[in-house]
Amino acid sequence: MVDREQLVQKARLAEQAERYDDMAAAMKNVTELNEPLSNEERNLLSVAYKNVVGARRSSWRVISSIEQKTSADGNEKKIEMVRAYREKIEKELGAVCQDVLSLLDNYLIKNCSETQYESKVFYLKMKGDYYRYLAEVATGEKRATVVESSEKAYSEAHEISKEHMQPTHPIRLGLALNYSVFYYEIQNAPEQACHLAKTAFDDAIAELDTLNEDSYKDSTLIMQLLRDNLTLWTSDQQDDDGGEGNN
């Protein structure tokens, strides 16, 4: 029998050493013990996979940019090499996302009781995020399918969070942040993105007195990110309105 506490300790150690693949493997094992995760364990799982997938997302963006430049040069051999490398990274990224989505569907979301609203929103948000990461690299019908799955998870989480969580709760705010990014970057729907982000920000401002001391730092940081995005997106829209739209 694997010792749960040892696995969690290993994940903490791996985080300090910035060995996120090890950290993710340890937290995957913890999750597969099929018992609910504590808040700390939940965060360890999230941080581990966010770093593992983040490295691949970053690599993919760099290689995609190189691929576009190479295509313009017309060097067939180099184009083929860059394309093959991009596809290798896409495979890795897809495998990581599928790993997380399996854990969410088979253990984490499944094991949430009716009243565990915070955990349910946390995991549904994660589900929306990892389908969104798949959508960033997918094309055609596959993209349409993962976009729909992402939207569905975000939407369900959004409804639960509005009904059962304070507007200043960091998980509710973090969900609004990522859901609005989904609208802006994946759905190419800037108006919906701005509306969602602005509503979340305004609702939180109106209830600042409900800010929990423990989560004050987290909540205010996410509010700042929401405001930064709004500033950027509204200026982008004004630029588009001023000239030809680039959507």
From Swiss-Prot:
- Keywords assigned by UniProt, alphabetized: Cytoplasm
Q: GO molecular function terms here? A: phosphorylation-dependent protein binding; protein kinase C binding; protein sequestering activity
Compartment list? Cytoplasm
Which Gene Ontology CC terms are recorded? cytoplasm
Specify the domain of life of the species encoding this protein.
Eukaryota
InterPro entries documented for this protein: 14-3-3 (IPR000308), 14-3-3_CS (IPR023409), 14-3-3_dom_sf (IPR036815), 14-3-3_domain (IPR023410)
Does the record bear Cytoplasm in its keywords?
A: yes
Task: Please name the SUPFAM superfamilies in this protein's record.
Answer: 14-3-3 protein (SSF48445)
Task: Choose any GO biological process term that the UniProt entry carries and state it.
Answer: protein localization
The record ties this protein, via PROSITE patterns, to:
1433_1, 1433_2
Instruction: Site Interaction with phosphoserine on interacting protein: give positions.
Output: 57, 132
| Summary of the function given for this chain in its UniProt record | Adapter protein implicated in the regulation of a large spectrum of both general and specialized signaling pathways. Binds to a large number of partners, usually by recognition of a phosphoserine or phosphothreonine motif. Binding generally results in the modulation of the activity of the binding partner.
Quaternary structure, per UniProt, is: Homodimer, and heterodimer with other family members.
Please give the family membership noted in the entry: Belongs to the 14-3-3 family.
Protein name per its UniProtKB record: 14-3-3 protein gamma
